[in-house]
Amino acid sequence: MIRENSYWMGIAEIAVTPDTGVVQVTKFTIGIECGKIINPRQLERCMKSGVVMGVSEALKEEVTFDKGKITSTTWSRYKILTMAEVPEVKAVQISRDDKGYGGGSEGANAVCTPAVAAAFFDATGVHARRIPLPPAYVTTLLKG
């Protein structure tokens, strides 16, 4: 993905439990080539926190409605990734002095959803046509 003069990539490794429909991202590798990197430690923090947000979006986060009104208005109704569910994250940075400068923040969460969806297809042979991937949806998909 190209964003703000930066090139992003994401690779998700997942585990799918067919009986329960639980999808777990076990490892995520995120990479960026954004020109000259000024603060690699801060960029790594942005990359890793973006992965946590993106994986949460891919697996859990969903705004729900009833008769046109939002019903996911509390933390008990709007699910997010727990600390126990956060995958191992590897951040890869490529710095190039000849390219100028690029952005290095919100692209991280943007590559997560397609990476998780691709890993789901690779693991199951089934295309998920929406996100998130809650267990009920996954079991329905796997039953065909």
Range-by-range predicted roles:
Residues 1-144:
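C-terminal catalytic domains of large/alpha subunits in multi-subunit enzymes
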